[in-house]
Amino acid sequence: MTCKIIGCGQYLPSKIVSNDELTKFVDTNDEWIRTRTGITQRHIADDTEYTSHLALKSAEKAIEDAGISANDIDLIIICTTTPDHSFPSVATKLQGYLGLTNIPSFDLQAVCAGFVYGLQVANSLIASSKYKTVLLIGAEKMTSLLDWNDRSTCVLFGDGAGSVILQRSSDDSGLIESNIFSSGIDYDILYTNGGISMNGTSGKIIMQGQKLFRHAIEKMQQSIEELLCANQFSVSDIDYFIPHQANVRIINKLAELLNIEEHKIIKTVEKHANCSAASIPLALSTLKGLGKIKKGDILLFSAIGAGLTWGSALIRW
């Protein structure tokens, strides 16, 4: 038994900040950002808009897209690294917003790989036959973790949320297989310099960009090749490749190494920037909204995040 995606939704804050606007308070320029990242703008939540609010707005759209009622949901998983509070979880707050009671809800923290991790966890719980309809969300307010004086990180991230509704599949559609990995010895490649038990703050993002670039390509390629081989798929079988939207150079290099045709690669990083766990469901929702996905299409997700955490998933639509 496997799960399938029956609905998608997304939400991006209304405030858009272009590269040119960033030059007003950080030493950078549009060409420098575009050539290194592919990013031209990012959405930024205001001070009164929290991760739970982003999650709610995307969830409502996914529920509508799936043609279900919120009352049909029997499990909520939110993948986030920017919760409203240390506790309770964003998922329980969202559950309250939706007026749901007596169902489990929890946050999952695997940073940019969170959605792939969440998909595997949700699928396992659906396969247990205990849960029928799962709301899985990637939601992030990454700009709350930025040092706006650090041009190596502040230009990279944005805010947003993407949601999917998952149900048990009764045919060959749905999650074919996924894999997830982590390597704790590499945690200092990307981390925040704060933490509740360490110094009582959330901290700001610290990143070793060149090391992360190398690890991202190596580990995502390995994950994808293992997944394809295990399921007797070739790259030519993939209809759409939806990678984590961290950096267009990573996406392009990975596609080159795997020989994935350009028209199959979904890129939203230009307009969304890096929305961490929200990036894949945002890209998926964007693609679905264009009406391009057909029944039977094979979708490949792949992501890497801090930890390091990484993984991939194959979906038959």
Curated annotation (Swiss-Prot):
SUPFAM superfamilies reported for this sequence: Thiolase-like
Major localization listed first in the record, in broad terms: cytoplasm
HAMAP family membership: FabH (MF_01815)
InterPro entries: ACP_syn_III_C (IPR013747), ACP_syn_III_N (IPR013751), FabH (IPR004655), Thiolase-like (IPR016039)
Gene3D superfamilies: 3.40.47.10
Gene Ontology biological-process entries: fatty acid biosynthetic process
UniProt entry tagged with the keyword Lipid biosynthesis: yes
Protein's name according to its UniProt entry: Beta-ketoacyl-[acyl-carrier-protein] synthase III
Lipid biosynthesis as UniProt keyword: yes
Pathway(s) per entry: Lipid metabolism; fatty acid biosynthesis
Family: Belongs to the thiolase-like superfamily. FabH family.
Active site: 112, 244, 274
Localization per Swiss-Prot or TrEMBL: Cytoplasm
Gene Ontology CC: cytoplasm
Domain commentary: The last Arg residue of the ACP-binding site is essential for the weak association between ACP/AcpP and FabH.
Reactions that this protein is recorded to catalyse: malonyl-[ACP] + acetyl-CoA + H(+) = 3-oxobutanoyl-[ACP] + CO2 + CoA
Organism encoding this protein: Rickettsia canadensis (strain McKiel)
Region annotated ACP-binding, chain positions: 245-249
GO molecular function terms attached to this record: 3-oxoacyl-[acyl-carrier-protein] synthase activity; beta-ketoacyl-acyl-carrier-protein synthase III activity
CDD domains in the record: KAS_III
Enzyme Commission no: 2.3.1.180
Function: Catalyzes the condensation reaction of fatty acid synthesis by the addition to an acyl acceptor of two carbons from malonyl-ACP. Catalyzes the first condensation reaction which initiates fatty acid synthesis and may therefore play a role in governing the total rate of fatty acid production. Possesses both acetoacetyl-ACP synthase and acetyl transacylase activities. Its substrate specificity determines the biosynthesis of branched-chain and/or straight-chain of fatty acids.
Subunit structure: Homodimer.
Stored PANTHER family: 3-OXOACYL-[ACYL-CARRIER-PROTEIN] SYNTHASE (PTHR43091), BETA-KETOACYL-[ACYL-CARRIER-PROTEIN] SYNTHASE III, CHLOROPLASTIC (PTHR43091:SF1)
Entry keyword set: Acyltransferase, Cytoplasm, Fatty acid biosynthesis, Fatty acid metabolism, Lipid biosynthesis, Lipid metabolism, Multifunctional enzyme, Transferase
